[in-house]
């Protein structure tokens, strides 16, 4: 076979020599030297000082980046490696992606799947399927549908998806029409992935769903309470060992259970998986000892049930493949290694690897060597700490010891328990064992109704989750008031919880506050206020639990100390998100406007759609500094699959189930490019790990000590697992000292000893064609940076490593033949010419007399993408112009003879010194008003109070006071400086534009209906007025109300009355309209022009009155359409 077998003695060496893998060794490059060499020898691109060096045919841009870049998604080297390793052309059946969080495992899995999909498309019939199984399958689908480079959607579809998503978010409702349109579009795209008739090859399942669909319990099985786990059980749960006969004969036992009518295996799924691909994300969830389930059994069955040559290929993913217990290595290896390649062709047993005879588990002699051997060629390991892409991780606090032994790796914020907590802890006796329903004592205790005053001697608190709710619910009203406790009654979606001043740092004098009940949460609250005072930065607070002392009480603590949820209105005690001062004391601060500090919360009892919306608001670029949402509180639902952007502080209030899951929590906020929008000095995350302590250490510190001890054993297994990682020589991960993510580790092969390059598989399996495409992209980016090249300069630039941002492969291994082929495809044609040739669509080839080389010059293209030929070609913009369609009629009506704003503004200042200001609405076009509104909002133009009042009377402009009744909207502009009367937005015909930053001139658009503006208000029964632009003038036009038009039966579309200039209507019609409008004047002596002015002004006055009635913008009668009103379409439909 072309590729080496896994059992070959020099497997990794043979693999590393192949060009498709060797080229992924990213060579070290001194960037300063690279820039110097480039400018001195062959290329002048951009950056400071570029004009002083290098040869060029055009002026350089000293403010440009010194390196060109390729736009769009570019797979990084680790992703390219596994794509090349696990594909239909290689014999390798199973692979574990052991990559740290945030490094792109999902993209890598999709890239692998795409190779198999391309292969399956060649099948005439019975093409296999690609199964994506895991709790995060929705995230993988999202990646597939937002990355056109992956080949599942077009750029146009992605643009449409973003448009619909933006509109749906603005609607503020998951059930709105806009949201339904978005969901329909997404469903259409998703069906393309899963519907074979539409070219789909994917099936997506959650672990539970996959297991339940694979194993269908029959009615007979249900009668006998049959459980699949009974066929795959641990023979001694106390010892946690497996019965060898049970595990080795599992497939046979499933067949027997099926024969006995207890179970029915889903044969459709089995046939779809035959020869297919199985992708399982967060694989550690399927065999976790602490959470018993049948997920792993289902995966093990589909991998073992087929003959080896028909079994599905498999890709497993996890940053922490072993979590709950080191003995999970047995389950992992049984999934990762095909049955026939395990020792003696039988599944591994725990007693083969571990000694469990004493009080602790130990690795057996030679067990780690066996792990090394079995994992060779089956593991990809990536640990990326490059500070160019990842934020720096900073631990607050200090290292602690427990029973004279220093705890490794972690720094803690030590929180001594309060006296009341200590007294409560005594109730559990010496060296207490904390049960699962008593975990609250790690964090806090609750007031106890058994004692009238909590300060009396020997008083102790409540902490047990089965006793506390009942005891507090039965407490008297007087006791609750006396102790500052408020009961939050449970509902269908809201569990029992408490609030009140006992959670405050500064309670009333007669009430014991937060410091009395919790040392940990008191320290947390003090740290939060300190962080806010220090400056900007978002905060993530994690707690593993929801109820009792979990995230629900954390939200009450924040609210009791002046931090609001997403929708509450500020009060006197609300804290400022910039300085942490309460609102009542904020008048003394002159350097910034009061912005209420807010938080949001994510936990399992909140609907997914609501969680997604809150996460989107927290991650939004407009919330980069945390001024809209400063804090997010999350339970264990955030541990996997969610990404948080630009978080500066992470507060961990409780240990997850184990240390590997703690690493996952760290990874939520330390992710690739997660902080790129922040200034370089703010690209860091400070982690606060809070622990409650007692004078002798305490039960929570003891829990950390035990879990860290277990984790050291897991780390030993991790080191063995990664020892012979397939990509160790390319990822070049060298760890010199123990760290949280890994013990010391060196790759078994280094770049220096890879050996000579082997080309046979590179050329045989299409990698040469891919190289041509890569070179073509590089050439295009070089031409976009500089329009004139010689052949030798261009080849040197293409073959220089790391010259192009986003390309990290070893360009020195590029073939010049492939470069020439790429250049031919971009520039040459069959035609020959002597002096000037323009071919194809990228570059011009010019022969310069007395020069040894042709010049390659970027072509200028017309809208048809045909080259334009003239002597200035080489200095023109390389980008082809965009072709736009223009509606001539609309252009003539709205575009020609427009007067500039400055001219109209001067005219306005002159004409409206004495005239009624309302008339400005009908004398100036929409463009003037929109420019004026933005000037009023951004620049606060002086002397415009009367105009502002007109805009506000007609609900065209909005102040902060106008937005305050809408809490969800107000938070968008609450941080904008100014008092309640400050203008912050204006209405257009489609939306309301709200200012988010005057300095940056950034706006946020929301639908009109979110401010109770109804664009389809009922028209009056008399006449409708509006202004229409005719060149430089505006004409007053009238038409019958739309309900009258709909009643008339018109057989000739030319007779449809769409409106006419008022002066052109007959005198009789004008007088009739005036009478109906109540214009009581002697109309016989009034000219048609003056009569129309009276009608116009009357309609405008009635429109203002209608809008100012209660709920007028929703239900008021329509009389006049202003410049920002959308006219209904008048179309003949008969």
Swiss-Prot record:
InterPro entries: Helicase_C-like, P-loop_NTPase
Motif stretch (DEAH box): 281-284
PROSITE patterns reported in the protein's UniProt record: HELICASE_ATP_BIND_1, HELICASE_CTER
Annotated catalysed reactions: ATP + H2O = ADP + phosphate + H(+)
GO MF assignments: ATP binding; ATP hydrolysis activity; RNA helicase activity
UniProt keywords, alphabetically: ATP-binding, Helicase, Hydrolase, Late protein, Nucleotide-binding, Transcription, Transcription regulation, Virion
Domain Helicase ATP-binding: 52-352
Superkingdom, taxonomy of origin: Viruses
Enzymatic class: hydrolase
Gene3D superfamilies the record matches: P-loop containing nucleotide triphosphate hydrolases
Domain Helicase C-terminal, chain residue ranges per copy: 524-725
Annotated compartments: Virion
Name recorded for this polypeptide: Early transcription factor large subunit homolog
Organism placement in taxonomy: Viruses, Varidnaviria, Bamfordvirae, Nucleocytoviricota, Pokkesviricetes
């Amino acid at each position: 076979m072309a590729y080496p077998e896994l059992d070959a003695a020099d497997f990794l060496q043979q693999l590393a020599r192949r060009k498709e893998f060797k080229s992924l060794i990213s060579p070290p490059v001194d960037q300063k030297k690279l820039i110097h060499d480039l400018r001195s020898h062959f290329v002048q691109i951009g950056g400071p000082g570029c004009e002083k060096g290098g040869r060029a045919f055009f002026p350089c841009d000293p403010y440009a980046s010194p390196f060109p870049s390729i736009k769009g998604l570019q797979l990084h080297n680790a992703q390219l490696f596994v794509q090349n390793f696990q594909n239909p052309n290689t014999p390798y059946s199973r692979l574990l992606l052991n990559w740290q969080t945030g490094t792109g495992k999902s993209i890598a899995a999709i890239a692998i799947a795409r190779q198999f999909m391309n292969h399956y498309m060649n099948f005439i019939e019975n093409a296999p399927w690609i199964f994506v199984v895991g709790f995060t399958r929705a995230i993988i689908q999202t990646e597939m549908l937002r990355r056109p480079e992956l080949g599942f959607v077009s750029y146009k579809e992605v643009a449409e998806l973003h448009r619909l998503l933006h509109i749906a978010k603005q609607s503020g409702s998951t059930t709105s029409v806009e949201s339904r349109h978005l969901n329909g579009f997404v469903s259409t795209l998703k069906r393309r992935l899963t519907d074979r008739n539409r070219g789909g090859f994917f099936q997506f399942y959650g672990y539970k769903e996959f297991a339940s669909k694979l194993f269908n319990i029959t009615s007979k099985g249900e009668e006998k309470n049959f459980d699949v786990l009974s066929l795959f059980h641990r023979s001694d749960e106390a010892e946690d060992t497996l019965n060898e006969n049970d595990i080795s004969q599992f497939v046979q036992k499933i067949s027997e259970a099926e024969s006995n009518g207890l179970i029915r295996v889903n044969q459709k799924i089995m046939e779809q998986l035959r020869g297919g691909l199985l992708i399982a994300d967060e694989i550690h969830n399927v065999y976790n000892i602490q959470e018993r389930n049948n997920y792993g059994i289902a995966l093990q069955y589909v991998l073992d049930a087929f003959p080896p040559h028909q079994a599905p290929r498999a890709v497993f993913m996890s940053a922490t493949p072993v979590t709950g217990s080191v003995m999970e290595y047995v389950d992992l290896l049984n999934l990762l290694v095909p049955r026939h390649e395990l020792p003696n062709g039988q599944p591994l047993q725990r007693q083969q690897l571990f000694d469990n005879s004493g009080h602790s588990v130990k690795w057996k002699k030679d067990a780690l060597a066996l792990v090394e051997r079995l994992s060779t060629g089956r593991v990809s390991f990536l640990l990326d700490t490059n500070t160019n892409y990842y934020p720096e991780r900073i631990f607050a606090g200090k290292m602690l010891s427990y029973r004279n032994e220093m705890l490794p790796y972690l720094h803690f914020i030590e929180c001594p328990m309060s006296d009341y907590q200590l007294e409560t802890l005594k109730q559990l006796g010496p060296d207490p064992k904390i049960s699962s329903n008593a975990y609250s004592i790690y964090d806090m205790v609750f007031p106890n109704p058994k004692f009238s005053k909590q300060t009396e001697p020997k008083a102790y608190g409540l902490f047990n989750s089965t006793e506390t709710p009942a005891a507090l619910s039965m407490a008297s009203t007087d006791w609750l008031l006396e102790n500052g406790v408020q009961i939050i009654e449970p509902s269908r979606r809201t569990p029992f919880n408490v609030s009140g001043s006992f959670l405050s740092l500064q309670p009333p004098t007669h009430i014991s506050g937060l410091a009395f009940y919790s040392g940990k949460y008191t320290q947390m609250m003090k740290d939060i206020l300190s962080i806010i005072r220090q400056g900007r930065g978002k905060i993530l607070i994690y707690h593993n639990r929801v109820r009792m002392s979990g995230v629900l009480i954390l939200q009450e603590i924040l609210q009791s100390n002046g931090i609001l949820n997403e929708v509450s209105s500020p009060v006197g005690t609300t804290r400022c998100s910039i300085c942490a001062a309460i609102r009542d004391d904020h008048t003394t601060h002159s350097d910034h406007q009061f912005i209420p500090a807010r938080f949001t919360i994510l936990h399992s009892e909140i609907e997914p759609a609501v969680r997604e919306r809150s996460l989107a608001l927290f991650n939004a670029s407009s919330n980069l500094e945390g001024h809209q949402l400063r804090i997010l509180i999350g339970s264990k639902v955030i541990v996997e699959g969610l990404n948080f952007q630009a978080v500066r502080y992470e507060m961990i209030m409780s240990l997850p189930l184990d240390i590997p899951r703690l690493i996952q929590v760290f990874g939520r906020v330390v992710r690739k490019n997660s902080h790129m929008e922040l200034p370089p000095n703010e690209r860091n995350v400070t982690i606060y790990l809070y622990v409650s302590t007692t004078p002798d250490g305490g039960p929570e510190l003891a829990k950390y000590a035990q879990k860290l001890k277990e984790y050291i054993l897991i780390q030993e297994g991790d080191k063995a697992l990664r020892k012979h990682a397939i990509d160790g020589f390319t990822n070049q991960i060298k760890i010199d000292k123990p760290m949280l993510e890994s013990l010391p580790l060196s790759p078994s092969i280094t770049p220096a000893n890879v050996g000579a390059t082997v080309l046979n598989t590179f050329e045989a399996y299409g990698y040469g064609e891919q190289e041509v495409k890569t070179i073509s992209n590089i050439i295009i980016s070089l031409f976009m940076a500089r329009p004139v090249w010689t052949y030798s300069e261009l080849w040197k630039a293409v073959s220089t490593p790391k010259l192009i941002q986003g390309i990290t492969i070893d360009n020195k291994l590029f073939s010049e033949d492939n470069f020439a082929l790429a250049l031919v495809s971009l520039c040459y044609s069959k035609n020959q010419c002597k002096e000037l040739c323009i071919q194809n669509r990228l570059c011009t080839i010019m022969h310069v007399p007395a020069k040894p080389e042709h010049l390659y010059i970027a072509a200028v293209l017309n809208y048809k993408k045909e080259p334009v030929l003239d002597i200035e070609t080489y200095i023109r913009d390389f980008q082809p112009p965009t072709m736009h369609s223009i509606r001539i009629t609309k252009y003539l009506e709205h575009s020609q003879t427009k007067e500039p704003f400055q001219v109209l503004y001067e005219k306005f200042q002159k004409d409206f010194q004495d005239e009624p200001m309302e008339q400005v609405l009908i004398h100036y076009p929409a463009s003037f008003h929109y420019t004026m509104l933005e000037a009023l909002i951004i620049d606060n133009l002086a002397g415009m109070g009367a105009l502002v009042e007109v805009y506000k009377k007609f609900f065209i402009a909005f102040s902060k006071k106008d937005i305050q009744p809408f809490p969800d909207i107000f938070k968008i502009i609450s941080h904008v400086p100014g008092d309640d009367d400050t203008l912050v937005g204006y209405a257009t015909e489609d939306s309301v534009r709200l200012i988010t930053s005057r300095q940056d001139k950034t706006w946020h658009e929301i639908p009109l209906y979110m401010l109770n503006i109804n664009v389809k208000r009922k028209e009056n029964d008399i006449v409708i007025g509006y202004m229409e632009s005719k060149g430089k003038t505006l004409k007053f036009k009238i038409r019958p109300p739309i309900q009258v038009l709909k009643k008339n039966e018109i057989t000739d579309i030319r007779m449809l009355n769409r409106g006419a200039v008022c002066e052109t209507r007959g005198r009789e019609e004008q007088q009739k309209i005036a009478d109906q409008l109540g214009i009581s004047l002697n109309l016989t002596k009034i000219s048609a022009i003056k009569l129309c002015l009276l009608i116009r002004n009357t309609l405008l006055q009635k429109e203002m009155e209608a809008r100012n009635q209660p709920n007028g913008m929703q239900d008021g009668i329509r009389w006049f359409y202003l410049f920002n009103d959308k006219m209904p379409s008048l179309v003949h439909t008969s």
